[in-house]
Amino acid sequence: MEMVFYPNDLLRVKTKQIENIDDKIRDYAKKMIELMDISGGVGLAAPQVGLDLALFVVRENKMARPLVFINPSIIETSYEFSSYKEGCLSIPGVYYDLMRPKAVVINFHDENGKSFTIENSDFLARIIQHEMDHLNGVLFIDYYEEKLKNKLLKPYMRERGLKAK
C-alpha cells in the first residue's frame, strides 16, 4: 500500500459506501493504520492510498488507540469554530491555518461492523473533518482563495518538478 500525492486525480474522487465489512476491508484498515503511523500522520483516508472506499483511520496521538471509520457521516457540527494549522500526508510540507467547527457528531461503523454515533471536539473533531473531506474529493487547500492556494503549493510543486500555477 502506497501513499497517493497531490495533484493525483485519485484524491478528487467521491468515494463509494462499503457494502460488506469483511476481512479485505479490515486488512485495508490495518495497512492504512501502519502507513499512517510510519508517515507520522494522525489520519489517513482511503483515497490517499488509491482506494475508492468510504473509509478512514485516525490516531489522535501516539498513545491513543487507532480508530477505524467506515461509511462515516457527520450529522451535526458546532456553531463554534476554531483555527488550527493543518497539513496533509498527501501534500507533505504544506501547512496553513484553517477554520473548522470545533465539535462534530459523527455516525460510522468500525472494522467489526458495529455502528457508533459519537461526539468529538477540538483536535479529534478537526482530524475527522479533514478525513471526511478526503472521502468527498476535497483537500484542505481547497478552502483557500486561489492566490493563497497557489502560493502555498508553489514550493511543493517545484520540489517535485511539477508545474505550479
Swiss-Prot record:
Q: Per the record, what are the reactions this protein catalyses?
A: N-terminal N-formyl-L-methionyl-[peptide] + H2O = N-terminal L-methionyl-[peptide] + formate
Q: Which GO terms describe its biological process?
A: co-translational protein modification; translation
Residues the record lists as binding Fe cation: 88, 130, 134
Give one GO term, molecular function aspect.
Answer: metal ion binding
* CDD domains xrefs: Pep_deformylase
Please give the Pfam families that the UniProt record associates with this protein. Pep_deformylase
Which keywords accompany this UniProt record? Hydrolase, Iron, Metal-binding, Protein biosynthesis
Which EC class is the enzyme in?
A: hydrolase
Per the UniProt entry, the Enzyme Commission number(s) are: 3.5.1.88
The record's free-text note on cofactor binding: Binds 1 Fe(2+) ion.
Stored InterPro entries: Peptide_deformylase (IPR023635), Peptide_deformylase_sf (IPR036821)
Tell me, in a sentence or two, what this protein's role is: Removes the formyl group from the N-terminal Met of newly synthesized proteins. Requires at least a dipeptide for an efficient rate of reaction. N-terminal L-methionine is a prerequisite for activity but the enzyme has broad specificity at other positions.
Name this polypeptide is given: Peptide deformylase
The primary gene name is: def
